[in-house]
Amino acid sequence: MKTRQKTLLTLLAVAISGIMQSAHAETVLRRGNGSEPKTIDPQIAEGTPEANIMLDLFEGLTTRDGAANIIPGVAEKWDISADGKTYTFHLRHTTWSDGTPLTAADVVYAWQRDVDPAAGGKYGFLLYPVKNAQAIAEGEIKDLSQLGIKALDEYTVQVELEASTPYFLDMLTHASTAPVPQHVVEKHGKAWIRPENIVSNGAYKMTAWQPNAHITLAKSDTYWDKDTVKIDQVIYYPTEDKNTEIKRYRAGELDMTYEIPDDQIKWLRENLKDELLIGPYLGTYFYGFNLTRPPFKDNPKLREALSLAIDRDIITGKITGVGEKPAYGMVPPGINGYDNYRPAYADL
């Protein structure tokens, strides 16, 4: 197995410098974004292209600063009980992009959608630390109001956990836990994410979505921290083919892209080294065994033997060569409270 790496080509420094040159000139960031998003509904979407856009449009109770530290998002502060099982979040008095107040009811509604099996979301498991979340997601409890979250008043949310969960605040930075505008979702149904309908609470709001062409976001004048948002417009360009996307970057059509063909990494390192950034990605690649039939079914010793035989250093250093790190477990490095597992045979 190998831990994943994130590759990024960016001319962002050049784009940002334009802000300093002219305080009144509109600054635009053109982002290559891989495949066309299927949806940008926070509780339904899955995949990196969708997440990139949603994190610009929506803000959860917590968020991260530039150093990846947990900081307040739409919740300006929170209290944690002595036993670590009760969190009380105090929301900012802010609004949705249509001017409607964002309240605790929107947070409760979003979390109930997240674990509702009828909604069809993929990330409800992130809320499993919350009381009754797993039972609701698995259909054992039908009443969504039994989820361990409630609005104490318009701007206070209380969450009850099954057990103390040290990483709970980290989980809340995921887009799937962001509040959604109940008044808009219930009015428009699945069409609520269309440009003419969508309402968001993040640093940006959507102004256009032309399928397979571009998605345009503009700085939101209702965002509580709008004065720190320095880029006026972000345009996401979907490109299914990585080679095409890198050509668009090199032609100056894109300011940044994460979609880089592995076979071009060496050339990019040699020729665009000041623009190429490779860093750890929170994920793990692995080989899976078919456990429904022989020889791997009911044969853990064989599976273990194959795992021992795989030279992870050869795979990461000679075959993929993008900078991945050898992996000896499913949990990648960088998880708070996790000590990297390295078995004795790794050094043989």
Residue ranges and their predicted role:
Residues 106-108, 119-183:
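Surface-exposed binding/hinge segments that line
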Residues 154-155, 163-229, 233, 241-243:
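Gly/Pro-rich hinge or "lid" segments in bacterial periplasmic/extracellular proteins
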Residues 325-348:
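Structural transition elements
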Residues 76-124, 158, 248, 296:
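Aromatic- and charge-enriched surface segment that lines or borders ligand/interaction sites
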Residues 35-51, 74, 122, 168-178, ...:
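A structural "hinge/loop" feature
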Residues 207-218, 235-294, 317, 326:
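Extracellular/periplasmic solute-recognition and catalytic clefts
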Residues 32-82, 112, 197-200:
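N-terminal lobe/hinge region of extracytoplasmic solute-binding protein
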Residues 104-110, 154-160, 202-203, 231-233, ...:
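Alpha-helical secondary-structure segments
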